[in-house]
Curated annotation (Swiss-Prot):
<keyword id="KW-0053">Apoptosis</keyword>
<feature type="glycosylation site" description="N-linked (GlcNAc...) asparagine">
    <location>
        <position position="348"/>
    </location>
</feature>
<keyword id="KW-0121">Carboxypeptidase</keyword>
<keyword id="KW-0812">Transmembrane</keyword>
<keyword id="KW-0472">Membrane</keyword>
<dbReference type="GO" id="GO:0006915">
    <property type="term" value="P:apoptotic process"/>
</dbReference>
<feature type="compositionally biased region" description="Polar residues">
    <location>
        <begin position="649"/>
        <end position="659"/>
    </location>
</feature>
<dbReference type="InterPro" id="IPR001563">
    <property type="entry name" value="Peptidase_S10"/>
</dbReference>
<feature type="signal peptide">
    <location>
        <begin position="1"/>
        <end position="38"/>
    </location>
</feature>
<keyword id="KW-0325">Glycoprotein</keyword>
<keyword id="KW-1133">Transmembrane helix</keyword>
<keyword id="KW-0645">Protease</keyword>
<feature type="active site">
    <location>
        <position position="190"/>
    </location>
</feature>
<feature type="glycosylation site" description="N-linked (GlcNAc...) asparagine">
    <location>
        <position position="218"/>
    </location>
</feature>
<dbReference type="InterPro" id="IPR018202">
    <property type="entry name" value="Ser_caboxypep_ser_AS"/>
</dbReference>
<dbReference type="GO" id="GO:0006508">
    <property type="term" value="P:proteolysis"/>
</dbReference>
<dbReference type="GO" id="GO:0004185">
    <property type="term" value="F:serine-type carboxypeptidase activity"/>
</dbReference>
Amino acid sequence: MAATTTTTNAGRSMASWKRLSTLIAAFTLSWTSSFVAAAGSADYFVHDLPGAPDGPLVKMHAGHIEVTPDNNGNLFFWHFQNKHIANKQRTVIWLNGGPGCSSEDGALMEIGPYRLKDENTLVYNDGAWNEFANVLFVDNPVGTGFSYVDTNAYIHELTEMAANFVTFLERWFALFPEYEHDDLYIAGESYAGQHIPYIAQAILERNKNAGPVNRKWNLSGLLIGNGWVSPKEQYDAYLQFAYEKDIVKKGTDLANKLEIQQRICQKEIAVKPDKIDYPECEAILQDMLQLTAGGVGASGKNQCYNMYDVRLKDDYPSCGMAWPPDLKSVTPYLRKKEVIKALNINDNKSTGWTECNGQVGMNFNPKTKPSITLLPDILSAGVPILLFSGAEDLICNHLGTEALISNMEWNGGKGFELTPGTWAPRRDWTFEGEPAGFWQQARNLTYVLFYNSSHMVPFDYPRRTRDMLDRFMGVDISSIGGQPTDSRLDGEKLPETTVGGAAGNSTSNQAAEKAKLEMAKWEAYRKSGELVLVIVIVAAGVWGWFVWKERRKTAGQGYMGVATGERHSISNNPGPRGNLSGGGDRTRGQGLAGFRNKRSGRRDVEAQDFDESELDDLHLSKPEDPHADSRYSIGGASDDEEEQKPGKGSSSRQPGGRS
């Protein structure tokens, strides 16, 4: 018995030592991994940046991370640390489009901390997005910008791209574990409207299997600017946008030719509805740019519309491919040997930086469905999405974005409809005293239109887009002093934020802003007649109670209250209800869209009370207010558009590309 006890105790002791040794080994491995990761991250530190302005250099890291070892697939990143921490840590990932266009466009021409004054000189970007968030630019997919891969291994599918990106993030967080618990936002523009939802879906799937080793990532929101999301609505928007901007006049031979091509496009989409790109539809934009070209510019060449900003003209057939003007400095700057060295570019990257790699675009031939099919599930998973548009962009224009929102069903509703016949109000946005656009919001989706802006909204208005970002992220900077910016919706001053280099006052009262939004929604209900119905129901209930009491008095069964006077009869007619263009018609892309230019008042068409017979008396008219035609609410027929970028030498934007 004693021997048995001794043996048992010895066994337990041995088991305890095994457990302890396992814990020690795990701790040692963890410590070693952390040490290796820390040492590895130091290799990515950017010690200096040629041409940077005087003063402290923004803390940054850059370099390559291998994602597909079998074919040398490496993604390049450039990370900028936030200048301030406001109530929580946040990281914003930025992606440009193409497919195959470098995110260094975003870093040096849009939202990064620096912009190029010329090819040798950097200046601070007033409105950079790294004020209250770390910003991570990634050249995605492999082969784009500074990223590289074997020439026979370009990706073909969106799911493949997303898997590579998740691998990148896992290895990036292993190098920089201090950011893995950040609120994570994914932002970008143009063809990134396909990439971002697929990456988000892959992250959500990964999070389902998260554990002690694979930590859950705090995916907190998506921002897509002038995105290519839903081909059906966006191809259909080309011609509609051209009509509204007077690029093409209805009834002309040119209009008839383009309408024929549009019908060919629509037929192809009807037959094959799940594609992302259609040559028959790309031809609408190509033909439009060619057939509207005319006049001779300073270069002696015919002039065509800039497809990224229709207020501008360009030499045909460039039509915007050399735009924006900063691009002429970005390419030579990123090809400088000292810049390549500073950004820790691998020697395996044998070719110089190009804005858009045509090989990436030509090899990308996805069979996966357009990203519009993913948005409802992402929204229902609790991930907020913000879509924003520049009003002067042709290729991915705002009409198409508004149409795809109007036709999309998510979180128990369709489009921005709050209840049948009642639409979320469009709230006029002024920024520092100037009309900036409008905001519209419902069920976790936000839409922002920027007046007087192009395909690359942050290029035009970095300060306004920073204000948009901070509000979307719910930045609370109450602990930081400074002069706040003046940003208002419907004339009401918003919770205070800051843009540019100076810190702002406070955005702590996010609840107050939500309350204002609820008030605006209630105003929409009131205008549409919903409030009248509520009053009638309540009044009918009160009247019924008085009738019951009087009957009990007459029967001698009730108590005797205050002496009663005349009974008041309450009509059960709820009064006029805002029909909202025939109720469901607007949600099918019909209704009042043809009359959007008729509006001259401040109220939303969807929220106004009117008799349906008045539709017969409406006529098209051109508003004098340059913003009037931009304020109609989502829910009617509207279109958006996309772009192609023909070659322009070594940094060519390829046909069909949306950067």
